[in-house]
C-alpha cells in the first residue's frame, strides 16, 4: 500500500469512511438549517435564507442519507456493535434533518404565499 492510499482513507477502519462522510455532511446541513431557522423564526429576515440553494441542499441531503445507509449496511455485516450503533445513529440523524428541512421549506412557502 502506497502512502497516498493511506492518506486517501484517513486511516479509518473499512466501511467507516461512508459514515464519517455522512456525518460531515450532516454537520454542514445542521449549520445551514440553524441559520435558516434563525432567519425565519427569530429575526424574520427572509432574504438571507437559503431559498436559492434548496435543490442543492435537498440533493446533498439525499446523498448523505444514501452514504449513511450504505455505511449502516456495511456495519451490519461486521460484528462491531459500536460501529453498528454509530452508523444507525448517523442514518437516523440525516433522515431527521431531511424531514426538518422539508418542513421548513413548506412552512416558508405557506408563509410567503400571497393571498388575494
Curated annotation (Swiss-Prot):
Residues 39-51, 108-116 are extracellular. Keywords: Cell membrane, Cell projection, Cilium, Flagellum, Membrane, Transmembrane, Transmembrane helix. The keyword Signal does not apply. GO terms for cellular component: CatSper complex; motile cilium. It is a multi-pass membrane protein. The keyword Transmembrane helix applies. Residues 1-16, 73-84 are cytoplasmic. It is found in: Cell projection, Cilium, Flagellum membrane. The chain crosses the membrane at residues 17-38, 52-72, 85-107. Coiled coil: none annotated. Component of the CatSper complex or CatSpermasome composed of the core pore-forming members CATSPER1, CATSPER2, CATSPER3 and CATSPER4 as well as auxiliary members CATSPERB, CATSPERG, CATSPERD, CATSPERE, CATSPERZ, C2CD6/CATSPERT, SLCO6C1, TMEM249, TMEM262 and EFCAB9. HSPA1 may be an additional auxiliary complex member. The core complex members CATSPER1, CATSPER2, CATSPER3 and CATSPER4 form a heterotetrameric channel. Auxiliary component of the CatSper complex, a complex involved in sperm cell hyperactivation. This is Cation channel sperm-associated auxiliary subunit TMEM262. The gene is Tmem262.
Amino acid at each position: 500500500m502506497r502512502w497516498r492510499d493511506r492518506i486517501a482513507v484517513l486511516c479509518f477502519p473499512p466501511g467507516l469512511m461512508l459514515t464519517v462522510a455522512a456525518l460531515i455532511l450532516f454537520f454542514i446541513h445542521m449549520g445551514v438549517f440553524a441559520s435558516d431557522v434563525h432567519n425565519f423564526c427569530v429575526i424574520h429576515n427572509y432574504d438571507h435564507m437559503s431559498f436559492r440553494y434548496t435543490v442543492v441542499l435537498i440533493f446533498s441531503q439525499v446523498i448523505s442519507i444514501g452514504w449513511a445507509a450504505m455505511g449502516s449496511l456495511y456495519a451490519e455485516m461486521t460484528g462491531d456493535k459500536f460501529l453498528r450503533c454509530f452508523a444507525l445513529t448517523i442514518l437516523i440523524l440525516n433522515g431527521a434533518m431531511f424531514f426538518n428541512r422539508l418542513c421548513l421549506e413548506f412552512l416558508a412557502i405557506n408563509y410567503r404565499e400571497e393571498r388575494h
